[in-house]
């Protein structure tokens, strides 16, 4: 199944959804932030370095109101 999205981690935080996903097993995972009502279009760019530590830091940033700073990256 080419281009099938596999969600590796997902967390709902303060009206947002933080997802770590990849298109297929040979692709590196990416992290993206969405609003809960629109899971089709991310509100910040996909993060290239997608690992558990980066995921946790992004979840914390969203939870503590630093979403604007993430958008500048």
UniProtKB/Swiss-Prot annotation:
Name of the protein: Putative gene 60 protein
Protein's gene: 60
């Amino acid at each position: 199944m080419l281009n099938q999205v596999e969600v590796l981690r997902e967390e709902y935080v303060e009206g947002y959804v933080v997802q770590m996903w990849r298109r297929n097993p040979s692709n590196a995972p990416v992290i993206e932030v969405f609003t809960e009502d629109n899971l089709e279009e991310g509100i910040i760019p996909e993060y290239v370095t997608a690992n558990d530590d980066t995921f946790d830091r992004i979840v914390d940033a969203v939870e503590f109101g630093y979403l604007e700073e993430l958008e500048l990256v």
